Amino acid sequence: METPLFYVETDKCTLCFACIRNCPVKAIDVKELTEWADISPDRCIGCGICYHNCPVNAIQFRQTTEEVSSILSENKDVIAICDPSISSEFTDIADYKKFVSMLRMLGFSKVHEAAFAVDIVALQYKKLFSDFKGKYYLTANCPSVVELVEKYHPELIDNLSPIPSPMIVATAIMRKIYGDTAKVVYIGPCIANKNELLKYSGTLRPDSAITFIELRQLFEKDQITEGKVEYSDFDSPIGEKGALYPISEGILESCSPDKSLLTRPIQTVESSSDVKEAIKTFEEDIEMLHKHLNLFMCQGCMMGPGCATSNNKHSRSAYTIDYAKKRISILNYTKWEAEIEKYAGIETPAVYHANDQRRKLPGKKQIAEILEI
């Protein structure tokens, strides 16, 4: 049986109720005759808010470091796909080329950046929005947003974008390049990726996903530091504006050339409370909203719960933009355009499953019985 994505170490829990107060979907409660919080895997959407709000570190997430170590030890060719958020996470490493070499030293034979897959995803969104025929969409780049819809707004599943997240698209590209049996590990700031990949199969499914927190643990375990490695660049294909993906608005740089608030057909919404409110408005009054929604439960992927460092949003955004400028300034556009044409046609159907977890309101009889207790 799969370990729950988030769970409580009961001996550490002090019942401070911080997790219960902050859970956006009320997936945490205290069971009768217990003295600790309990997370319902069925109701949980994997946002990680409880993990970051627990003052005593009683809440943990499913670790996959041993799984990745096993993949690396048992296979000669293992591909690492790095989320573009590395630009704001690994600022303690002097040069990204050192970071790439550290991954190779860990045992990865190929090291790719997901920015190119984001470029592909952005082009798909651009086509989706330009072919607009009166139907509005919710982007599906954030797996926690997808689970929020699947579990608490299942009527909106048809409005979820038919385009999967960059992790899935990047995996499909890697399998196209290296073959269907290639081992793929996704490295990023999102804990929910660990559950997201379980929805997919075949060439669309990564073999594992680890967070930046776990990657740092692997570096420490093998005593890998930048001082021990030489420079090494990412393997091709290289991305363009996909490097801006860690910022919530980043993907719109490519898929929505219209920057005007008056005419742009897409509205970006980030953070759990605003996302919940936006989805409710989308569901109840879409004719007033007249917008597609670009949704992220965090303040951009650069602020994901799987990040190990505590840089604030503004510094992370600055690091991301600076990195993107450097990468774009040296991009071979002729090669990039050829690779976009080569891989843009890969079929990557999104997978969604309705899983209604809404609690029914008690009837008058039940309320009366409760009040009598």
What are the language-model segments listed below?
Residues E2-T10, T14-S40, I45, I49-T65, ...:
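Iron-sulfur cluster-binding cysteine motifs and their immediate structural context
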Residues R62-I373:
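Iron-sulfur-associated redox domains of electron-transfer enzymes in respiratory
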